[in-house]
Amino acid sequence: MESPAPGARCPVQEQRARWERKRACTARELLETERRYQEQLGLVATYFVAILRAKGTLRPPERQALFGPWELIYGASQELLPYLEGGRWGQGLEGFCNHLELYTQFAANVERSRTILQEQLKKNKHFRRFVRLQEGRPEFGGLQLQDLLPLPLQRLQQYENLAVALAENTGPNSPEHKQLTRAAQLISETAQRVHTIGQKQKNEQHLQRIQALLSGRQAKGLISGRWFLRQGWLLVVPPRGEPRPRMFFLFSDALLMAKPRPPLHLLQSGTFACRALYPMGECQLHRVFGHSGGPCGGLLSLSFPHEKLLLMSTDQEELSHWYHSLTLAISSQKN
């Protein structure tokens, strides 16, 4: 049996060396980005939060709504950084996980913060002047307050990626392996909760926008609590006569058909009148034509217990998107 050549490395050693290189690279990236993150957190905490508190330019409720738990997040970074600088990744991230709830609170406040910022910049001239002065400081490097406010949520995604990479490239026999694995799991769970909060906020924005487009008494509260999927114009093909354009709003549980108000309507020009609300749990969907990807559009058939809809589009790609979205809505209700 031949012995390995002198200087040759076995596959296990090579794998360990790759892990160690990736671990060192990830650890360096975590440290360098944490320093920059803490610096930017400090800019907002020092030049905005602290000075606004001292000057009283904003009332306490408005200041709290604008910045949320910013100073506590800054403090959590100040606790973490010395551990990273000392190479104690597992211990540092394990302790940092005690502060993850701050990121959930911050995410829940994002839309309120954005609204307060826009309102105060518009109506509070003292605040507007203060913001311009602070943003003009050389320390900000041209960054505006609105650029810095999303930082914690962006950083949480980086924490997740880096913590997972550190855990994956730390050997199971390392004393830090258990700490890093647990930290990566907790950070990933928090990132998922934050993502869910963001999705709900976007959906609420869609619902508010759509509600503003719908007019008439029967439209009030019609879409409250629903999950928005898609909207757009489609042609309704009647049994006799010409196809009629209608605006459709698709939610996870219902399809709303609306008719545009006349352009010369005194009070409701530019809005839509609700014509029907179809339950997706009772829908049977078929693609009549438009399977081939040709240029001539397509036709969808939607059957409900007491009505059948034929929906047409001259844009086959658009119709394919509708078919996919309708299929998702139907399956979500039947599951």
Swiss-Prot record:
Q: What is the protein name for this chain?
A: Rho guanine nucleotide exchange factor 39
Q: Which InterPro entries match?
A: ARHGEF39 (IPR042987), DBL_dom_sf (IPR035899), DH_dom (IPR000219), PH-like_dom_sf (IPR011993), PH_domain (IPR001849)
Alphabetical GO CC annotations of the entry are:
plasma membrane
Cell compartments where the protein resides: Cell membrane
Q: Name one GO biological process term.
A: positive regulation of cell migration
A GO molecular function term, named singly, is: guanyl-nucleotide exchange factor activity
User: Where does the record place the PH domain?
Assistant: 227-331
Keywords linked to the UniProt accession: Cell membrane, Guanine-nucleotide releasing factor, Membrane
From what organism does this protein derive? Bos taurus
Q: Which Pfam families match?
A: RhoGEF
| Residue span, DH domain | 22-197
Entries under Gene3D superfamilies matching the protein? Dbl homology (DH) domain (1.20.900.10), Pleckstrin-homology domain (PH domain)/Phosphotyrosine-binding domain (PTB) (2.30.29.30)
Superkingdom, natural source: Eukaryota
